[in-house]
């Protein structure tokens, strides 16, 4: 049985106020967010450790996203918890020395992902695998700047998904990072911050302005 839907504890002004500690927001999210939501936003684990790596903007975004998506604790079936959750918990148990061998911690991810259609939860791409995707990219105002999904039946027959090696910089970083968390058949909505999209320069040829937050609907149809 689903838990009662929590009420918003703070206004936007209170959330951004320095008087509200990050730990309070993290505790609220851990108390009320589902495991998969917390894993997606890297909010699992000891509150003190999470507070060290998560900045205030990321926590405010996660707080608002929790109420937008309604992914509260008890709202998802236990089986919905992905391998990503297990991996996060395993990584927390690793000794700290191993971190020196990895790339420096860059803080929270610069994207959020909402699952629109579940995948098989078995086949996940690895770095260097070729992935095949259908996608539509829009700006925040809803303007479509790119898509490979055809509407006319004639064009549909000739349409092919986008294929590329994932995790090696062939596409924007938001795509590279997000697709590694998706399983075959999954469709997701990605909201990518400018830092992991086209940054300060934008992409004038594609009519993407500077510092643009991009929204994609991506379906991972196959992995080679």
From Swiss-Prot:
The modification N6-acetyllysine is found at residues 99, 170. The modification Phosphoserine is found at residues 36, 152. The modification N-acetylalanine is found at residue 2. It is found in: Nucleus. SUPFAM superfamilies: FKBP-like (SSF54534). Pfam families: BTHB, FKBP_C. Its EC number is 5.2.1.8. Inhibited preferentially by rapamycin over FK506. GO terms for molecular function: peptidyl-prolyl cis-trans isomerase activity. Residues 87-119 are annotated as: Disordered. It catalyses: [protein]-peptidylproline (omega=180) = [protein]-peptidylproline (omega=0). Signal peptide: none annotated. GO terms for cellular component: nucleus. FK506- and rapamycin-binding proteins (FKBPs) constitute a family of receptors for the two immunosuppressants which inhibit T-cell proliferation by arresting two distinct cytoplasmic signal transmission pathways. PPIases accelerate the folding of proteins. Belongs to the FKBP-type PPIase family. This is Peptidyl-prolyl cis-trans isomerase FKBP3. It comes from Oryctolagus cuniculus (Rabbit).
């Amino acid at each position: 049985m689903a838990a009662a839907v929590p009420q918003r504890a703070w206004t936007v002004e209170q959330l951004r106020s320095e008087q509200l500690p990050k730990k309070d927001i993290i505790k609220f999210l851990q108390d009320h967010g589902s495991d998969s939501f917390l894993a997606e936003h890297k909010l699992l684990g000891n509150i003190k450790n999470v507070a060290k790596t998560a900045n205030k903007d990321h926590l405010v975004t996660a707080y608002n996203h929790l109420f937008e998506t309604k992914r509260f604790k008890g709202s998802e079936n236990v089986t919905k918890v992905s391998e990503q959750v297990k991996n996060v918990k395993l990584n927390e148990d690793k000794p700290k020395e191993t971190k020196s061998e990895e790339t420096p911690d860059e803080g929270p991810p610069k994207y959020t992902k909402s699952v629109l259609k579940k995948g098989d939860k078995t086949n996940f791409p690895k770095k260097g695998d070729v992935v095949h995707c259908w996608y539509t990219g829009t700006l925040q105002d809803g303007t479509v700047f790119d898509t490979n999904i055809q509407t006319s039946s004639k064009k549909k027959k000739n349409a092919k998904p986008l294929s590329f090696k994932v995790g090696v910089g062939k596409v924007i970083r938001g795509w590279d990072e997000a697709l590694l968390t998706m399983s075959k058949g999954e469709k997701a909505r990605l909201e990518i911050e400018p830092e992991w999209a086209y940054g300060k320069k934008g992409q004038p040829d594609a009519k993407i302005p500077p510092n643009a937050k991009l929204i994609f609907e991506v379906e991972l149809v196959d992995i080679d």
